[in-house]
Amino acid sequence: MVKFIESELVLLKKEIDEMWTLVYNQLDRAGDAVLTLDRELAQQVLVRERRVNAFELKIDSDVEDIIALYNPVAIDLRFVLAMLKINTNLERLGDFAEGIARFALNCHEPALDTELVKQLRLEEMIAQVLSMLELAKQALQEESQELATAVFAKDNMLDEINADATAILADYISRHPESALSCLNLVSVLSLIHI
């Protein structure tokens, strides 16, 4: 019995790794789609979101099966529940990627103002989120509390960047009222990126 649950836990961790990679790629594509307003790339993110949702359901089902069939206790139960929580959060990040891609798909501007992107530090925010995801995955794989703690430091940097965004956008809207709708929609993108 112990050997069976161990193999199931290894498979579950492998599935979480695959889901993590899928969501990372979704966020990366969505970020690129926003920065370039590439509607085709944004559409790819929307199409792949169905795969993220299906994968989440499969992992949920696998977790239920492990609990029902093997009745894990102690460390195994904590591991299974942690994988369930990670799976839920990854699916939520996939939803955020979809929301970011929708902005790129529905934006009426031909391109984002490069100066605005620079002031908002949008590229830096996207890179920071992707870095946080990589670091969190590495922390899980290596079971490193130190790496997990480093994710929080990166989150503080995102907070700092995001804190200035509203004032920057308000100033931009006052100087470019024709872009007000896109700027207001960009606020929601920033909140999604800020996760």
Model-flagged regions — what are they?
Residues 1-193:
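Cytosolic, long alpha-helical scaffolding segments
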